[in-house]
Amino acid sequence: MESFTRAELVAQRDGVWAVCGEVFEAYEKCRMEKGSDPELCLRESTAVVGCSQKVMREIVKNCQKELNESVKCIEENNMRTIPCEEENKAFNECFDKLVAPKFL
Amino acid sequence: MVGYRQKWVQDLPPAGGFPKLKYARTSTSPIPGAYIFAGVFSIMAVGTYIFFSDKVERNAREEEEKRRLSMILPILQAENDINFLASPHQNVYFTRWMPPQTGKRAAALLRDL
């Protein structure tokens, strides 16, 4: 399982929710219903990690430059995403053009 | 008899006498208290307005940041769950089950992902 930094995950939040939104909601619903024991929601958590990893792999393959710019901006602004709207817009354009057609 | 050569001059008031001293009270132009109160109040009102408008904007910004961060919480929590299950663990608490903090560890369940 590959690890990504918080800035990378936050930078691509809209993209990963567009693809894996249903899986995330199912996982959140399971955790809300069944409590904190991780074994009870193992299937959902595995699906969440698998889906996000898949999307991140495609993003790193196709939109590395835009992702790096977004991550650099977020890290320079103390993990704030609001000052990085321009970089995030460029990344979203790249995501919509190159990564989204493979999943949606 | 000492033979001083300097001619002594007595220190006397000037001819005609000293002018009168101005010892009467002189007050500045009076400013009414209401004017002072209004001025200070207006300054404080402006400052308070600036502070609260900036506070509202700051709170809105923080809420937006929190919302955006919460979008990635499923990923972080799922990774934490899988890392915890992939590590040797036992329940060491007697009150309720609480997941302990685990370091980064390769999850055996997703080794081929």
Curated annotation (Swiss-Prot), chain A:
Membrane association type:
Peripheral membrane protein
Renumbered to this chain, motif Cx9C motif 4 spans 84-94
Family annotation (InterPro entries): Ig-like_dom_sf (IPR036179), NDUFA8 (IPR016680)
The organism's superkingdom is given as Eukaryota
The biological process GO terms on file are: mitochondrial electron transport, NADH to ubiquinone; negative regulation of DNA-templated transcription
Keywords attached to this Swiss-Prot or TrEMBL record, sorted alphabetically, are:
Disulfide bond, Electron transport, Membrane, Mitochondrion, Mitochondrion inner membrane, Repeat, Respiratory chain, Transport
Disulfide cysteine pairs (residue numbers): C20-C51, C30-C41, C63-C94, C73-C84
Renumbered to this chain, motif Cx9C motif 1 spans: 20-30
The UniProt entry, under SUPFAM superfamilies, shows: Immunoglobulin
Q: Does the keyword Mitochondrion apply?
A: yes
Q: Where on this chain is Cx9C motif 2 (motif)?
A: 41-51
Q: What is its main location?
A: mitochondrion
Q: Where is this motif: Cx9C motif 3?
A: 63-73
> Residues in domain CHCH?
17-59, 60-102
Where can this protein be found? Mitochondrion inner membrane; Mitochondrion intermembrane space
GO cellular component, alphabetical, reads: mitochondrial inner membrane; mitochondrial intermembrane space; respiratory chain complex I
Q: Which family does it belong to?
A: Belongs to the complex I NDUFA8 subunit family.
Function of the molecule: Accessory subunit of the mitochondrial membrane respiratory chain NADH dehydrogenase (Complex I), that is believed not to be involved in catalysis. Complex I functions in the transfer of electrons from NADH to the respiratory chain. The immediate electron acceptor for the enzyme is believed to be ubiquinone.
Q: Please give the subunit comment from the record.
A: Complex I is composed of about 45 different subunits.
Name of protein: NADH dehydrogenase [ubiquinone] 1 alpha subcomplex subunit 8
Origin species? Dictyostelium discoideum
From Swiss-Prot, chain B:
What is this protein called in UniProt? Answer: NADH dehydrogenase [ubiquinone] 1 alpha subcomplex subunit 13
Coiled-coil ranges from the UniProt annotation:
none
Pfam families per UniProt: GRIM-19
Q: Which GO terms describe its cellular component?
A: mitochondrial inner membrane; respiratory chain complex I
Q: Which domain of life is it from?
A: Eukaryota
Q: What is the purpose of this protein? A: Accessory subunit of the mitochondrial membrane respiratory chain NADH dehydrogenase (Complex I), that is believed not to be involved in catalysis. Complex I functions in the transfer of electrons from NADH to the respiratory chain. The immediate electron acceptor for the enzyme is believed to be ubiquinone.
> InterPro entries attached here?
GRIM-19
**What parts of the sequence cross the membrane?**
31-51
Q: What is its main location?
A: mitochondrion
The similarity annotation says:
Belongs to the complex I NDUFA13 subunit family.
Source organism (scientific name):
Dictyostelium discoideum
Where does this one sit in the cell? Mitochondrion inner membrane
